[in-house]
Amino acid sequence: MSVKSVPIERDVTPGLTYPALAGSDVRAPSVAAVVVCILLVALTLRPGIVSMGPLLTAIIDELGLTHTQASLLTTIPTLLMGLLALPAPWLAHRFGRDRIILLALIVLGAAIILRALAGSIGQLFASTAAVGAGIAVAGTLFSSYVKARSPNRIALFMGIYATAIGLGSTVAAVATGPIDQLIGDWRWAGGFWVLPALLAIMAWVGIEHRSLRAPVSTSSTQMPRMPLRNPTAWLIALFFACNNLVFYALIAWLAPMYIERGESASSAGLILASYTLGFMLANPVFGLLSRSDDRRLLLAASSSIALLGSLAMAVAPDAMPLVTAALAAFGTGGAFTLGMTLPLDNASTPEEAGAWTAFVMLQSYLVGAAGPLLVGYLRDSAGHFQSALWLLVAVGALMLLVTPFLQPYCCRR
């Protein structure tokens, strides 16, 4: 594979100061090699979470878990995505970004295998936490890798990255149920998803072996200051938190809900796949439509679509579930794409943008982690999922009500 000699890039995350790797000249991988890395790593960042949805009913039956306890299999990884948003950049500064990404991928792959071998509930939850840690650290640092390796193609490469994440989610949602039926064991149906992780590890070592060997400078790191006293920052965090809560609640419980309503595991997996596919398709659509600095109209439109889909599932869950799930996902996917730009719209410098992004991600994933837990608790309390669906409708309505107040900084002056 062709390579060219360029100075090694700096490990840059907005809002943080990173030194370059020691050494003045390191041969960077080709564009094609970078694309391979992006695709394989992105494809492995969601199956460890999404694959649990089609398997929750089997896990509950075998281990005797309550729905509240089972919800932790999705809640724990999502929670760690928020908690590890801040220490991950420090680890990258201390030990090198590419080394930490490799370590995170190894942890992710090992944890998926350990979860398949779990002999107790404690081991199941501990291995799930390790899955979440690997996803959280790799996902947090990988956008920095994309920006560093493709400074002139950031939009294109980030689009490839986001689409590959959605594709990995969709494939896991579609395939996990049939794999479970074929193998007859939920453990190895979940353990199957170590294969993308192994491919990502091999690609990472093969393509980024030079940066993995390069020594790292350890000068001081300037951490960003979070906008704790800014009302707009809290409103953005609230909007993003509502969106994450709805998304992760449905990722965890959509398949079990329809299995409980009489669908087979494969059919329920297809409904979940329509949800992940709708989310993936919304990313480029709303990204292309968003041309104005003031995105409130599109934010309201995406929130309304998400609310309409959730409302349709609550009122008539058996009426065209493939369509209603895709509708809800298209709205949450659009809100996610637009919401990611809001911290940047309200920041005047890269350092400030990093601080806003870290603040929003921390708050939104911590709240989003409560979604699967709340749905599981309401299912245990009520004996059905109907009250949980109405909770998601209420959260979607709150998200819509927040949109008029998400005016960017440039339009407030």
Task: Give residue ranges: language-model regions.
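Extracytoplasmic gate region of multi-pass secondary transporters
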Residues: 52-53, 231-273, 279-283
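Conserved MFS/SLC helix-loop-helix module at the cytosolic interface between two early adjacent transmembrane helices
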Residues: 83-122
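Helix-loop-helix hairpin linking two adjacent transmembrane segments in secondary transporters
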Residues: 152-153, 159-209
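Cytoplasmic helix-loop-helix junction between adjacent transmembrane helices
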Residues: 127-164
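Helix-breaking motifs and short loop linkers at transmembrane-helix boundaries and internal kinks
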Residues: 64, 96, 117-122, 151, ...
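Intracellular juxtamembrane helix-capping segments at the cytosolic ends
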Residues: 137-150, 334-348
